[in-house]
A protein has these predicted regions:
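Conserved ABC ATPase "signature" region
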Residues: 104, 116-133
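Helix-to-loop junction immediately C-terminal to a conserved catalytic motif
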Residues: 51
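ABC ATPase NBD coupling module
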Residues: 68-84
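Catalytic Walker B motif of ABC-type/P-loop ATPase nucleotide-binding domains
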Residues: 163-167
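Conserved ABC ATPase signature
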Residues: 137-141, 145
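The feature captures the beta-strand-to-loop junction immediately N-terminal to the Walker
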Residues: 36-38
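Conserved ABC transporter NBD signature motif
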Residues: 59-69
Length: 219
């Protein structure tokens, strides 16, 4: 199967500090790749770059054979609406809004058909077990509940080609871990490629491929 995303010589520098140097990798459809390593090794920043949200990195990134350097801003926005689903570390949630309003807004931002938005929001809320939280403000939720809402937001994209998750089991319990594992299986089953930034050994063991940043020794 052809590579979904290829990276050659990725280097990331922030504040004069080299976070990632000369990283090369490839992501394929129908597989989970775990990105792990110690805190401060650049995992989250790497995920942000690979999802094409951060262009302030050097090296070559190509999505389905097209260089990111050759993509127009409009093309990148289209990928973010229809093809690249991202759950970043800061979760992309508006704290002062209710859970339902956050998800409705996310459905609108993905340019989903108006008539389908309500049904789709209800569907993903049920899938991620946040129906009972619909009217609660995000800033009243626990860490695990917030993560479930963030996963629901990510799940709104119906047929992503690439899914990028940053610490999706952080602050959660066994139920959240089981939810994430099930969602990984669903995405892989629909031929999406998944990149998951994680310290969770269960997700590392679930992955077909593991990339370690920093000085963490290989298992």
């Amino acid at each position: 199967m052809a590579d979904l995303l290829t990276v050659t010589g990725l280097t990331i520098v922030r504040g004069g500090r080299v976070l990632v140097q000369d990283l090369s990798l490839s992501l394929t459809r129908g597989a989970v790749t775990a990105l792990t390593g110690p805190n401060g090794s650049g995992k989250s920043t790497t995920a942000w770059c690979l999802s094409l949200h951060d262009r302030d990195c050097t090296g070559e990134i190509a999505f389905e054979g097209v260089s990111a350097a050759d993509m127009s801003p409009r093309s990148v926005r289209a990928l973010h609406r229809r093809t690249i689903a991202l759950q970043p570390q800061h979760l992309l949630l508006e704290d002062s809004w209710s859970v339902a309003r956050n998800l409705r807004h996310a459905a609108w931002s993905l340019a989903l058909p108006w008539r389908r938005r309500s049904d789709l929001v209800s569907e993903v809320m049920a899938r991620t077990a946040v129906e009972d939280l619909a009217r609660r403000r995000v800033d009243s939720l626990s860490g695990g509940e917030r993560m479930r809402v963030a996963l629901a937001r990510t799940r709104l994209m119906r047929e992503p080609g690439l899914v990028v998750l940053d610490e999706p089991t952080a602050g959660g319990d066994e139920g959240l871990s089981a939810l994430v594992t099930g969602m990984l299986d669903e995405w892989v089953g629909s031929a999406a490629g998944v990149l998951v930034v994680t310290h969770d050994q269960r997700l590392v063991e679930r992955a077909e491929h593991v990339i370690r940043l920093g000085d963490e020794p290989a298992a």
